[in-house]
């Protein structure tokens, strides 16, 4: 009898955990961090979800996109517009466009300046991604085939 109560308790606990996991709503968030990086966090983020972030590229810096924390099936489209949204020097036309897939990372060069970055989910995604800058070491290459191309 004691063993049966234990089994029933464990089954009840398993059902509660399963039901609570099923109730989570999809999440897609983009945030600009104090360390001059952009974080993308998603849990079953629906296709076409969108967010904005800001990034400053200095002299002799390159942009790093890292989606190694995102599920392999996920894909993000990134558009880098020169200037800060709402400022006089903001351009609605992207200076650079690229995409990054889950599990991949890439490095590319960009002109120094401030950028408004539009992040768009090209598929349903789960996981994390990060966009940041780092000092250029003279050898800039894409980790995969997702090197950005200027749109001008």
Across the structure, where does each feature detected by a protein language model lie?
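Bacterial N-terminal signal peptides that target proteins for export
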Residues: 1-11
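C-terminal motif of bacterial Sec signal peptides marking the signal peptidase cleavage site
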Residues: 17-21
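Transition segment at domain starts
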Residues: 23-56, 142-150
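Post-signal-peptide N-terminal segment of Sec-exported extracytoplasmic proteins
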Residues: 41-79
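Beta-sandwich interaction modules
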Residues: 53-56, 96-111
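Noncatalytic modules at the cell exterior or secretory-pathway interfaces
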Residues: 61-65, 107-125, 129
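Short, surface-exposed beta-strand/strand-loop-strand elements in extracellular ectodomains
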Residues: 73-92, 132-134
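Edge beta-strands of jelly-roll/beta-sandwich modules across compartments, strongly enriched
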Residues: 74-76, 123-143
């Amino acid at each position: 009898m004691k063993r049966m109560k234990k089994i029933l308790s464990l089954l009840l606990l398993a059902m509660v955990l399963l039901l609570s996991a099923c109730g989570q709503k999809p999440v897609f968030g983009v945030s600009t961090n104090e360390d001059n990086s952009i974080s993308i966090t998603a849990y079953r983020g629906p296709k076409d979800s969108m967010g904005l972030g800001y990034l400053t590229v200095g002299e002799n810096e390159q942009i790093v996109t890292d989606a190694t924390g995102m599920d392999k099936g996920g894909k993000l489209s990134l558009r880098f517009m020169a200037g800060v949204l709402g400022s006089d020097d903001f351009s609605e036309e992207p200076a650079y466009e690229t995409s990054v897939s889950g599990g991949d990372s890439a490095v590319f060069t960009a002109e120094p300046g401030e950028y408004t970055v539009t992040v768009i989910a090209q598929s349903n995604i789960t996981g994390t991604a990060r966009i940041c800058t780092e000092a250029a070491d003279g050898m800039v290459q894409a980790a995969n085939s997702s090197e950005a191309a200027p749109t001008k």
